Structures are given as C-alpha cells and as structure tokens.
Amino acid sequence: MPDKPTKEKLMEQLKGGIIVSCQALPGEPLYSETGGIMPLLAKAAQEAGAVGIRANSVRDIKEIQAITDLPIIGIIKKDYPPQEPFITATMTEVDQLAALNIAVIAMDCTKRDRHDGLDIASFIRQVKEKYPNQLLMADISTFDEGLVAHQAGIDFVGTTLSGYTPYSCQEAGPDVALIEALCKVGIAVIAEGKIHSPEEAKKINDLGVAGIVVGGAITRPKEIAERFIEALKS
C-alpha cells in the first residue's frame, strides 16, 4: 500500500487524467454479495491509463487496494432516513475510511439536513481536527455549497451531486457552468457527474479542473447499453 500523497503530489498525478468510479449497489447487475467484481473494473481502468479510482465501501476499497496502487477516492454510501445525505454522511463512515489509508475521503457537503445535525462547515472542521493529514473531497451540488466547503478547509470540491438535489441545476449532462464557476474562484475542482463522453471530458479538462471522475459511462454496462438502445428509438 503506497504512502498517502500530499495534495500537491496528488494534483500532479490527477492532472489531465481520468479517475474511474468503480461502484455497484445492491439491485444493480454488477453488484455481488461476495465481492470480486469492482477490482476487475479497477484493473481494467488501470490498464486503460486511469490516474485514480473512486470506490464505495470498505470491502470494495480493500479489494481494489489489493490489485492497484492508484490513488483511491473512497466513500461509504449509507442511508440515514429521513435525512437525504448518504455519501459518507457521518463521522462513523469517515472513521472507517480513514483506517484504510486511502488518498482522499469524499463526503456529502450539501446544505441538506444531516443525520448528525451539524452544518457542513462544522462537520468539515471536526473531520480535519480528527484526521489532519487526510485529504478530503466535498461532494456538492451548487456553487454556494462548494464555496462553504472550500472556506471550511476542504481540499477538493466535487460537482458530484449537481442534479441530485432538488434545488440544483437539473441537466442531462455535466454541470459545466458550475465546474467553470468554481474553477474561476481558485477552487481545486474534481468534476464529476453525468460526464458521458470523451468530448465532454476534454471540454471540462480545458476549464482547469484538478481532476475528472467518470463512472457510469465506463463502469455501468446496463447504463451504457441503455444509451445505445434509446438512441435507436429516437
């Protein structure tokens, strides 16, 4: 297992490359109770030249770490109804991820009500105090959320949740305007969400992002097949 990189070192590694998100949830075709599938996707991503992996759950991350030294952005998806945030939503999930020695921990940093009752700035500060050497990524849906997370000391701001909160931009494709606005104020942006084509990725890279995450367009074969099938119907 490689040493955790500094922010500067990681930014060098991610610049101009693609981080591949390798995830499957229960009910999806590539999900397996016994595991073993996500590391195969990660291996394929590495062989293609990916510069990093985004992965969900302790099990999947450990399996991926066993086959690649690529930096991992780790999350734990867990529902806390009635609250909506579910991506590394409490310190419990942060603790589990911190124990894995991964490069980056990503967490929900939207303004929605949280299970722990904290506002985002307070949550970020608590995590930074507990794990001062851990790089952190804020999954946000609007410019204001990204700014709050940045001002609270987050290392990277990801546009992961744009379109997935009721008050954010509802686009079929990536929220390029949000990505551009965050980059313009000097935030280290990891563009993520609804990036469906190499052309979109190239356009986003030219905005000066710190990194680009592509998931469904690479690692969800059902979604990829549906896109082809729907195109023939139109």
Curated annotation (Swiss-Prot):
Alphabetical list of CDD domains matching this protein: NanE
Metabolic or biological pathway, per its Swiss-Prot or TrEMBL entry: Amino-sugar metabolism; N-acetylneuraminate degradation; D-fructose 6-phosphate from N-acetylneuraminate: step 3/5
Reactions catalysed according to its record: an N-acyl-D-glucosamine 6-phosphate = an N-acyl-D-mannosamine 6-phosphate
InterPro entries to which the protein is assigned, alphabetical: Aldolase_TIM, NanE, RibuloseP-bd_barrel
Domain of life: Bacteria
GO biological process annotation, one example: carbohydrate metabolic process
Keywords attached to this entry: Carbohydrate metabolism, Isomerase
Gene Ontology, cellular component aspect: cytosol
EC number(s) per entry: 5.1.3.9
Pfam families: NanE
GO MF term list: N-acylglucosamine-6-phosphate 2-epimerase activity
UniProt keyword Isomerase present: yes
Gene3D superfamilies the UniProt entry points to: Aldolase class I
Span of the signal peptide: none
Job of this protein: Converts N-acetylmannosamine-6-phosphate (ManNAc-6-P) to N-acetylglucosamine-6-phosphate (GlcNAc-6-P).
Family: Belongs to the NanE family.
The name this protein goes by in its record: Putative N-acetylmannosamine-6-phosphate 2-epimerase
